[in-house]
C-alpha cells in the first residue's frame, strides 16, 4: 500500500510533521496528514460505506451483487470480498467492544454477527460472506449465507426488493462522500484532494475517477444531495444515516466545489 496517513495530534510539532512527510515521500509513500478521530480519514469513511452496503443486503441485494456493482464501477474489491480478506471477526470484536462501552444504547445485531457466531470469519476459516476452496482465494457464493440473510430479513419482517447496479453504487459512494464532507468540516482532512489521495492509494478507488470527492463533483453535489434526501424519505429507520452533512449541503446549494 502506498498510502501513509500521518496523524497530527494537538501537540505535534511542525518540524516533526514536516519530517514525517519527507520520510514518507523518501520511502515511496503517499503521505496524507490527518487529524485525530476514530479511524482517521480512510477507515472512518469506510464505516458508512459498509453500512450502506449492509442496508442494501438487508433490503434485498445479495453480497455478490453489491460486490459486482462496485467492482464494475472500478473498485479493486467489493466490501464483502474485502471483509472476508480482512477477517469478519475483527469487526465483530469492535462491535462487541463498543456495545460494552455504551450499555445504555441497545445493540442492534447485524448479519455479520450471525456469520461470526457460525464460525465464518472469512478466508482464514474458508468461509465468510463467501466460501473458499483450500488454497484458493476465489470467492464462491454460498447457499448457507443466502439462507442466513433470508432468515435475518424474515425475523425483521423485511420483504426483499430488487436494486439496480446504479443504485447500489450511488448509495455506497454517496455515504462515503457524505462522511468525507464531515471530515473536511471538522478539519480532520485539510483538503478534499487529501481524501481523494487516501482512497486512490489506500482503498482501491479507481484512479480514472479521481477519488470519491472528485467523483461527487463530477456527478454534481446537488445530485448527490438530492439522492441522499430521497433515500432518507424512503426509510424512516435510515433517515438519520442519510442526513446530509452541512458542508455538503452548503456547497450543493452554492454550486461551489469542495476544496
What would you call each of these model-derived segments?
Residues 1-259:
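N-terminal glycine-rich phosphate-binding loop for ADP-containing cofactors
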Amino acid at each position: 500500500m502506498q498510502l501513509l496517513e500521518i496523524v497530527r495530534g494537538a501537540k505535534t510539532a511542525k518540524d516533526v510533521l514536516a519530517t514525517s512527510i519527507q520520510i514518507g515521500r523518501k520511502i515511496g509513500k503517499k503521505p496524507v496528514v490527518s487529524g485525530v478521530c476514530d479511524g482517521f480519514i480512510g477507515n472512518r469513511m469506510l464505516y458508512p460505506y459498509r453500512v450502506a452496503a449492509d442496508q442494501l443486503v438487508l433490503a434485498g441485494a445479495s453480497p455478490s451483487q453489491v460486490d459486482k456493482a462496485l467492482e464494475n464501477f472500478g473498485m479493486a474489491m467489493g466490501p464483502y470480498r474485502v471483509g472476508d480478506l480482512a477477517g469478519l471477526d475483527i469487526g465483530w470484536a469492535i462491535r462487541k467492544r463498543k456495545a460494552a462501552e455504551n450499555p445504555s444504547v441497545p445493540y442492534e445485531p447485524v448479519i455479520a454477527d450471525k456469520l461470526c457466531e457460525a464460525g465464518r470469519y472469512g478466508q482464514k476459516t474458508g468461509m465468510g460472506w463467501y466460501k473458499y476452496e483450500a488454497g484458493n482465494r476465489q470467492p464462491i457464493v454460498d447457499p448457507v449465507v443466502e439462507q442466513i440473510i433470508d432468515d435475518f430479513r424474515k425475523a425483521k419482517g423485511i420483504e426483499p426488493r430488487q436494486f439496480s447496479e446504479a443504485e447500489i453504487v450511488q448509495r455506497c459512494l454517496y455515504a462515503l462522500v457524505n462522511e468525507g464532507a464531515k471530515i473536511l468540516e471538522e478539519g480532520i482532512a485539510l483538503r478534499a484532494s487529501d481524501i481523494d489521495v487516501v482512497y486512490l492509494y489506500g482503498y482501491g478507488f479507481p484512479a480514472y475517477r479521481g477519488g470519491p470527492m472528485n467523483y461527487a463533483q463530477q456527478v454534481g453535489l446537488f445530485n448527490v444531495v438530492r439522492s441522499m434526501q430521497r433515500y432518507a424519505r424512503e426509510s424512516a429507520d435510515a433517515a438519520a444515516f442519510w442526513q446530509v452533512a452541512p458542508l455538503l449541503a452548503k456547497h450543493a446549494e452554492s454550486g461551489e466545489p469542495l476544496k
